[in-house]
Amino acid sequence: MHIAIMSRNKNLYSTRRLKEAAIARGHDVKVVDHISCYMNINMTSPSIHMKGVELPKFDAVIPRIGASVTFYGTAVLRQFEMMGVHPLNESVAITRSRDKLRSLQLLSRKSIGLPVTGFANKPSDVPDLLDMVGGAPCVIKLLEGTQGIGVVLAETRKAAESVIEAFMGLKANIMVQEYIKEAGGADIRCFVIGDKVIAAMKRQALPGEFRSNLHRGGSATIVKLTPEERSTALRAAKTMGLNVAGVDILRSKHGPLVMEVNSSPGLEGIEKATGIDVADKIIQFIEKNVKATSTKTKGVG
């Protein structure tokens, strides 16, 4: 097969591993910088160009779209879909999962466990909002934040009110969530491919830190999932419409709670923590599922 990997940097660990795995299985691979692409949108022969050259025909595309370029990246992916290229994850599913508030609302509708979450527009609603999530301590998150950036643990009600009002004053969209103390600064990343959780790791925050992101110095170890945790991860990925996803779960006294569903999960942490060749499993999944007509939405919506 001819496979395109949408990535800003061919030297990134995940991009490099996916390319190596695809080549090892006999496929032709091209890394495409989606920000350097531009599109010819017409009714007879839509195409994608890069640096003055029309891209060749691909059988499948693996989107590795960073959060900061979601709009343009998914536009390029939609163009691939309209041209009949099979996407590992569809543009609609990626867009859905990148909207943190919408994704929580969709998960809630499917009765999937979540931390109690509040969202408001006016500073006058802040006191009631804090009551909704059980008061302080609570977690305040920028909707546009990634890798733990824009996430604040407010340990007192006064601190929470000050942080929320400051964010609102900057016209930033935020949500407020209950703090799950019993998680102990740890979460579980479940790596979902198709209808299976193929790997899982526990990420532990540094002492004095509550954010367990590996980008923030957290450590990762292999972990055994309970049947309920496995089921929750699969249901969360399916609700987003994602074939490949990193589902982040907190262990709480109420059972597993989904924090986030990541449409472009990194491979380095999970492969090194578990020893599992995740990249190879992704390529195998593509081999089994590629059909020119298998994009459900055809780039619509």
Swiss-Prot record:
Keywords: ATP-binding, Ligase, Magnesium, Manganese, Metal-binding, Nucleotide-binding, Protein biosynthesis
One GO-annotated biological process of the protein: SOS response
Pfam families per record: RimK (PF08443), Rimk_N (PF18030)
Domain ATP-grasp: 104-287
Binding site for Mg(2+) 1: D248, E260
Cofactor(s) needed by this chain: Mg(2+); Mn(2+)
InterPro entries: ATP-grasp, ATP-grasp_RimK-type, ATP_grasp_subdomain_1, RimK, Rimk_N, Rp_bS6_RimK/Lys_biosynth_LsyX
Cofactor binding annotation: Binds 2 magnesium or manganese ions per subunit.
GO molecular function annotation: ATP binding; metal ion binding; ribosomal S6-glutamic acid ligase activity
Residues annotated for Mg(2+) 2 binding in this entry: E260, N262
Binding site for Mn(2+) 2: E260, N262
Listed GO CC annotations: cytoplasm
Binding annotation for Mn(2+) 1: D248, E260
Binding site for ATP: K141, E178, Y179, D187, R211, S212, N213
EC number: 6.3.2.-
Annotated family: Belongs to the RimK family.
Matches recorded under PANTHER family: RIBOSOMAL PROTEIN BS6--L-GLUTAMATE LIGASE, RIBOSOMAL PROTEIN S6 MODIFICATION PROTEIN
Protein's name according to its UniProt entry: Probable alpha-L-glutamate ligase 2
